[in-house]
């Protein structure tokens, strides 16, 4: 049995990339909400932190899309 099959119940590596993409996009969206909360509270340090985290999630999402696109050709 392949390692990914034991971990996720499927041998499809595309599922794993799609899952990372989903969670990255969800994280970026959630950080957007937290960013708005911090800005409304006037906490610029926290707002900057959420901007950075959101940017990281977006980078992960972009990388996931690239990897998935390459594998679906």
Predicted regions mapped to residue ranges:
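Amphipathic alpha-helical hairpins
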Residues: 2-73
């Amino acid at each position: 049995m392949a390692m990914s099959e034991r971990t996720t119940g499927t041998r499809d590596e595309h599922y794993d990339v799609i899952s990372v993409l989903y969670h990255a996009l969800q994280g970026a969206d959630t950080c957007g909400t937290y960013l708005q909360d911090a800005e409304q509270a006037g906490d610029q340090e926290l707002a900057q932190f959420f901007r950075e985290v959101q940017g990281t999630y977006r980078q992960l999402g972009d990388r996931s899309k690239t990897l998935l696109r390459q594998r679906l050709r």
